[in-house]
């Protein structure tokens, strides 16, 4: 029997899979996500995000996606390669950061058990 290699977890893949799990179409989700000027994002823009061709242009979009899709915003910020505002304001010294990062990596190897 052939081993199946799991697909890499990306921002776009997470958005698409969660949207489908919630039974939302791209059109329905796009209508709930608004740009800073209050207009909804386009279906094509959402499609580009889901297929990792584009990244969300603003923090507010990530926060809205997290809320509508019932996902943790910190997780989406991580997948998008961004740090939440409170983390950016309190950037630790290099030694503290290295210790925290090492602990995080160990927790991943342990399957999140700690």
PLM features: what roles do these ranges have?
Residues 1-23, 31, 102:
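A short, Lys/Arg-rich alpha-helix, primarily the initiator
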Residues 36-37, 53, 80-84:
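The DNA-recognition helices of helix-turn-helix-type DNA-binding domains
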Residues 40, 51-67:
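Short, basic-rich loop-to-helix N-cap that marks the start of a DNA-contacting helix
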């Amino acid at each position: 029997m052939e081993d199946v290699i799991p697909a890499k977890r990306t921002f776009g893949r997470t958005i698409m899979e969660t949207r489908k799990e919630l039974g939302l179409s791209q059109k329905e989700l796009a209508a709930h996500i608004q740009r800073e000027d209050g207009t909804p994002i386009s279906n094509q823009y959402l499609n580009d995000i889901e297929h990792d061709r584009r990244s969300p242009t603003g923090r507010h979009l990530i926060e809205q996606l997290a809320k509508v899709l019932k996902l943790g915003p910190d997780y989406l910020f991580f997948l998008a390669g961004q740090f939440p505002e409170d983390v950016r304001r309190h950037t630790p010294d290099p030694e503290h950061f290295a210790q925290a990062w090492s602990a995080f990596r160990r927790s991943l190897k342990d399957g999140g058990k700690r």
